[in-house]
Structures are given as structure tokens and as C-alpha cells.
UniProtKB/Swiss-Prot annotation:
This is Homoaconitase, mitochondrial. Catalyzes the reversible hydration of cis-homoaconitate to (2R,3S)-homoisocitrate, a step in the alpha-aminoadipate pathway for lysine biosynthesis. The gene is LYS4. Binds 1 [4Fe-4S] cluster per subunit. Its cofactor is [4Fe-4S] cluster. It catalyses: (2R,3S)-homoisocitrate = cis-homoaconitate + H2O. It comes from Candida albicans (strain SC5314 / ATCC MYA-2876). GO terms for cellular component: mitochondrial matrix. Its main location: mitochondrion.
């Protein structure tokens, strides 16, 4: 069983309010016991999201859906299919996949958007599927984008999507929520892209890893255009967060009023006078006594244009610093769901007008959607960019995901308005990729080097001021909330077949970022005939070849931070189960690994204090796998963990997130697929 519980939160938080993330989840949580129960960070909930989007991966989701025994989607109004990733690929194989997706969607009555209509996330916003204060998910990591319009958007994996198709529901553990406060006024020439690139670079020690983010600061945010907010929310994914939520304010309401006028469809099913009136009259805000895991602050007035890279979002430098280095570029890109909306294209056109793309540079442009391109054509911005020498691509992901025309080759340098510059992401692993705003990308395309718009007029880039920032963690209010809830905590109901407690000796794997290949070597991933016993023997093999001989069934692995980072292979969870281990503890877990855990019924706990104590205990010990002689007991009925040493001396007592009976049911059924099959059978 793999189920993940974070220790940052409490269980029966009867005496405090909710933050905005918790309030939105409350609206979409089902099966709460009692129905009036409030939900908080750390709690597992069953959610029925407003909408669920899948893109080119819709066919694998459909295949999984059918393999579950499902034949009809639960609610075809909940599901959206878009084709956006590999739209330049005209191979028979890809066209067949696209045809299969379209046929399936139409047979189910699902809203379907074909290749060329645009990037799924942009469509979700244009067509109102992602709407302020709703919960919208997608089988894509950039679902965070929806936070820019005040929707709680978060990614899911394919099994989750298949579950939603079949039952309308999946599970979510509410993450710790980080408050990111924006103060000050953004200087002229500084954009939303500069804000998020700076945040990724200055808070680059996983401060918000696997957190939900709420952006606050009414004065500063009110002056940020919605397109800036969408860019910022989009790249909270690269910052490590699971969502990036902006508040509902007058700027957002005005955005939707203008959108309604542009649609010219009074009876639009999602964006209409009624939904906008509801938005105005029913604004949700965080309670004054809501608890946040962290409070980060950045003064926007101290920002200047910033650039990410090369090849890492954790590296950011001011435009001033990089412009001094005369870094020649080969390719420039104005594409993606991050920065290819109308305002982005217009901004690039304003910079490039009257200039020509440098003869040593290839400049590629693709609109975020066909509607955006149409608007850009009507405004003249699209033609301005093409007249300068840019090469148009169809509306879609393209180079951002490393597909189609214009990829980086060995030794090349590219600057892009996209969201990811991981090595090899946009082409060759031997290329260098930088991320910047549309304005800087356009200027660089003309200059032939990384540079700013002012250089086109013969002026130097202004020197960057020092960024003013701060961070607070584990506030007193959070600690007080935990102690209060401890006193108020009652007994949690336990379903037949689910253990009331789990206990075992802690086995220390003292490393951070143990990836899925370290847990389950890739060379075994596609050996479909491998037995459970063989899986057990190779569990953690690439991390420590002696792991099997040092461990036994019933042990509990405890590891460092970001355990399970890497690929989406489910065997990283199932091989641990094969070793006879029901629970893993870590400082934190990779998000995909976490979802695969629950979906395969393995339990996990995030307890940073415990791994830190063990690291102090075994400082200087270089063994990879250590039997600690410390024993953990997790009392599920009280949502409490106790750790003692071999002499029964108390090491730690800590509250963890509550596991309700709805999530217990998933575990008892052997994971999410087993639960879905049971639901389908019950409802036949």
C-alpha cells in the first residue's frame, strides 16, 4: 500500500480558519465524514474537480480507462480533450493516434479541440473551463497556469485522469500552503516573466517544493495584468509548486467582462453574465486565522529584467549581467503556454518593429491558440514579427517540448519565452537554453546576442538593483494550530481491512533526491515477466546493492528530501511493496512518485524533523543503508506518529494528515485502479 501523509499539518483543526486553497478544495471535496468537516493542509480528500483536461496523452488515458472495464465516461461535461503537443508530426502513427482520440471523444460526447486550435491550457482559459474559484486538473504539469485567473489548477497522472473519466473523482492530499507576498510597484520594462524567473532563482533551495502557493498583496497584484499572472502561475511548476493561486480582484472581473464581450455569445455555457455576477457576489478569501507553512516576500520595485539559465531555472541573472557577456545566440523562440498570448506577441512586435532578425539567428513564433493568432493578425502584430524575419509555427507546444521544427542543435545557444530550459528539453543536450520575457527574446533575436530592447536604440542596459526579499517558515501560528488540534483531536473511523496502526524499524537511506532509477533500475522497467520476488531483490539496487541483504519485510524506509524524483515508472512504488514494506518516510517526496504511491496503495509520511534527527545521530556514517534501531508507530486512529529508540526512549511525537474512510477504501481495494473497478461494478 502506498499512501502519503505530510506532517506539516494537523488533523482536527476545529479552532482555526482556512486559507483560499483549502476553501476551494472544500467546495470540490466529496464523501467527507461528517459532511460539515473542514479540510486542511495534510488531509487526504476525494475530489470531484470541475473539469479535467488531457492532451496528446488522451489516448493512453482512454486505453487505461477501457482496461478498467469502463465503457462510458461518468460526466462528459467534466472532460476536455485537446491536441497540442506534437501537432507538427504528420506521421501515420501520430495521425492515427489523433484520429483515435477524436473518435473516442466524439463517441463519448466529450468537448474536443483538434490540432491547430491551440495549447490545452490556453483553451481551458479562453473557453472558461478553468474559471475563478473552481478546481480544475489536467494530466499535464503546467496545470498550475489556471491559478493566474484565480482557479486552483493542479496536475494529475494518467491513472487519476482515467479514474475521473470513469467515476468523476480522484484523490488529493492538500499540500502545505506557502504565502508569497508581492509588494511594491513593478518598474517599467519589467514583466510577469521577470517576476517568476527571479523567484525561481533567488528562492532556489526547494523552498516551495510540493507546496500550494497563494500570491497575496492587493496593491501590487491589482496592477499586474492577467497575462502576467498567468505567466507567473504557469512557471510555479518549475519553481517546484503544485499550484500557484492568485486572488479574485477587480482586475480579474474586468478581464472576464471583456472576455464576454469578445466572445459575443451571451449563452456561453461557462463565461456569461450569470457566472460573472456569481464571481462578483461570492468572492472567497483566506480567513484571518488561516495557517501557512511559509511566508515569502519580494519587493517588485527592486526587480529588473531577469533571465533564467543556462539549462536550469534555478539559475537566474539580471539582463544587465548577461548583456555584458555578449552571449551570441543561434535561435530565439516566442512560443508556449507561458508567453504566447496576444499581449506577449504585441510586446515582441513593438520591440522588433523597424528591425530585422539577425542573419545568424532563427526566430520562431507560435501563438498559444488559433484565436490568439487571429487577434494578432488583426492587430498587425503577427505580420510585424514575420516581416522582421521570424518563422511561424502552428499554434501548439512544438519546440518547448522538443518536438517539430527549430530545435536546438549541438553547440547552439537559444533564448526562449517558454518555461523549461532543462538540458536537452528543447533539442540537443549539448546546447544551452535561456528563458526570458518576450521583449528580451525579440531584442536578442535582432541583436544576435542576449540583450535588451534599449540596446536596439544604442542605449546600455541599466544596472540591476539588489532584489529585496524575505522568507519566514514554521510560524508560531502554525505551531499553535497544531497544539490546539492535538487537544481537540478525536478518533478516526477505520474501515474493515485497513490497519489501525503501522509500525516497524526505521531503515535509513541517507540521501536526498533518490530518483526512480535508484529505486527501480530502468533496465528492468519493461521486463513484463519479472516476478514479485525478483522485483524485491532489485529494489533500491542502483542506490545500494546491499539494500536487499540489509532489510526485511515490515521495515520502514526513511530517506531525505525529494525521494522518488525522476520518471513516472510505477515500479518505483510496487518494488517497495514487493519487498514487504508498507510505509516509507522521507523529508519530502517527488510529486509523481507520490501519486503513483497512492495509486498502487503504498503508504508514505513526510516528517522532516525525523530525518534531520537521524542525520544528526548518524553524522559521519557513510553507510548507504543503516538499520537505526529506532522504531516508528503510526496510529492511524489518532493521526499521530511516535518514534522510540531500542530502549523505548521517546524520540518524537508528531501529528500527521488525516486519512478518511474514502481514502482508506482506495487502499483496501489495492489502489486507485482497484477502487475504480469496484465502483464500476457497484454501479452496474
Amino acid at each position: 500500500m502506498m499512501l502519503r501523509f505530510r506532517s506539516f499539518s494537523t488533523t482536527t483543526h476545529l479552532l482555526r480558519g482556512q486559507n483560499l486553497t483549502e476553501k476551494i478544495v472544500q467546495k470540490y471535496a466529496v464523501g467527507l465524514q461528517p459532511s460539515s468537516k473542514k479540510v486542511y493542509s495534510g488531509d487526504y480528500v476525494t475530489i470531484k474537480p470541475a473539469h479535467c483536461m488531457s492532451h496528446d496523452n488522451s489516448w493512453p488515458v482512454a486505453t487505461k480507462f477501457m482496461n478498467l472495464g469502463a465503457s462510458k465516461v461518468k460526466d462528459n461535461r467534466q472532460i476536455v480533450c485537446t491536441l497540442d503537443h506534437d501537432v507538427q508530426n504528420k506521421s501515420e502513427q501520430n495521425l492515427t493516434k489523433y484520429t483515435n482520440i477524436e473518435k473516442f471523444a466524439k463517441s463519448q460526447g466529450i468537448d474536443f479541440y483538434p490540432a491547430g486550435r491551440g495549447i490545452g491550457h490556453q483553451i481551458m482559459i479562453e473557453e472558461g473551463y478553468a474559471f475563478p474559484l473552481n478546481l480544475t486538473v489536467a494530466s499535464d504539469s503546467h496545470s498550475n497556469t489556471y491559478g493566474g485567473i484565480g482557479a486552483l489548477g493542479t496536475p494529475i497522472v494518467r491513472t487519476d485522469a482515467a479514474s475521473i473519466w470513469a467515476t468523476g473523482q480522484t484523490w488529493w492530499q492538500i499540500p502545505p500552503v506557502a504565502k508569497v507576498e508581492l509588494i511594491g510597484q513593478l518598474p517599467k520594462g519589467v514583466t510577469g516573466k521577470d517576476i517568476i524567473v527571479a523567484l525561481c532563482g533567488i528562492f532556489n533551495n526547494d523552498e516551495v517544493l510540493n507546496h500550494a502557493i497563494e500570491f497575496v498583496g492587493d496593491d501590487a497584484i491589482s496592477k499586474l495584468p492577467i497575462d502576467y499572472r498567468l505567466t507567473i502561475a504557469n512557471m510555479t511548476t518549475e519553481w517546484g509548486a503544485l499550484s500557484g493561486l492568485f486572488p479574485v480582484d477587480e482586475t480579474l472581473v474586468e478581464f472576464y467582462q471583456n472576455r464576454l464581450k469578445k466572445l459575443n455569445k451571451p449563452d456561453h455555457p461557462r463565461i456569461n453574465n450569470q457566472t460573472i455576477d456569481q464571481l462578483i457576489n461570492n468572492k472567497l478569501t483566506s480567513d484571518n486565522d488561516a495557517v501557512y507553512a511559509k511566508h515569502l516576500q519580494i519587493d517588485l520595485s527592486s526587480l529588473s529584467p531577469y533571465i533564467s539559465g543556462p539549462n536550469s531555472v534555478k539559475i537566474s541573472n539580471s539582463l544587465y549581467d548577461l548583456s555584458q557577456q555578449n552571449i551570441a545566440i543561434n535561435k530565439a523562440y516566442l512560443v508556449s503556454c507561458t508567453n504566447s498570448r496576444l499581449s506577449d506577441i504585441q510586446a515582441a512586435a513593438d520591440i522588433i518593429k523597424g528591425h530585422k532578425v539577425n542573419p545568424n539567428v532563427e526566430f520562431y513564433v507560435a501563438a498559444a491558440s488559433s484565436l490568439v493568432q487571429k487577434d494578432a493578425e488583426q492587430s498587425g502584430a503577427w505580420q510585424t514579427i514575420l516581416d522582421a524575419g521570424a518563422k511561424p509555427l502552428p499554434a501548439g507546444c512544438g519546440p518547448c517540448i522538443g518536438l517539430g521544427t527549430g530545435l536546438l542543435k549541438d553547440g547552439e545557444v537559444g533564448i526562449s519565452a517558454t518555461n523549461r530550459n532543462f538540458k536537452g528539453r528543447m533539442g540537443s543536450k549539448d546546447a544551452l537554453a535561456y528563458l526570458a520575457s518576450p521583449e528580451v527574446v525579440a531584442a536578442s533575436a535582432v541583436l544576435g546576442k542576449i540583450g535588451g530592447p534599449e540596446e536596439l536604440n544604442g542605449e546600455p542596459v541599466k544596472q540591476a538593483p539588489r532584489i529585496i526579499k524575505s522568507i519566514e517558515t514554521e510560524s508560531n501560528s502554525a505551531n499553535e494550530a497544531e497544539s490546539t488540534s492535538e487537544e481537540a483531536s478525536g478518533s478516526i473511523d477505520i474501515l474493515p481491512g485497513f490497519p489501525q496502526s503501522i509500525e516497524g524499524e526505521l531503515i535509513l537511506c541517507n540521501a536526498d533526491n533518490i530518483n526512480t532509477d535508484g529505486i527501480y533500475p530502468g533496465k528492468y522497467t519493461y521486463q513484463d515477466d519479472i516476478t514479485k520476488e525478483q522485483m524485491a531483490k532489485v529494489c533500491m539496487e542502483n542506490y545500494d546493492s546491499q539494500f536487499y541483504s540489509k532489510t526485511k519485510p515490515g521495515d520502514i524506509i526513511i530517506s531525505g528530501y525529494n525521494f522518488g524524483t525522476g520518471s513516472s515508472r510505477e515500479q518505483a512504488a510496487t518494488c517497495i511493496l514487493a519487498r514487504g514494506m508498507k510505509l516509507i518516510v522521507a523529508g519530502s517526496f517527488g510529486n509523481i512518485f507520490s501519486r503513483n504511491s497512492i495509486n498502487n496503495a503504498l503508504l508514505t509520511l513526510e516528517i522532516p524533523d525525523l530525518i534531520n534527527k537521524l542525520r544528526q545521530q548518524y553524522e559521519g556514517n557513510d553507510e548507504l543503508t543503516i538499520r537505526t534501531g529506532w522504531f516508528l508507530k503510526w496510529d492511524v486512529t489518532k493521526a499521530q506518529v511516535t518514534v522510540v529508540d531500542g530502549d523505548d526512549n521517546l524520540i518524537l511525537t508528531q501529528k500527521v494528515g488525516e486519512l478518511g474512510t474514502n481514502l482508506q477504501d482506495i487502499i483496501v481495494k489495492g489502489g486507485l485502479e482497484g477502487w475504480v473497478k469496484s465502483e464500476l461494478k457497484t454501479n452496474q
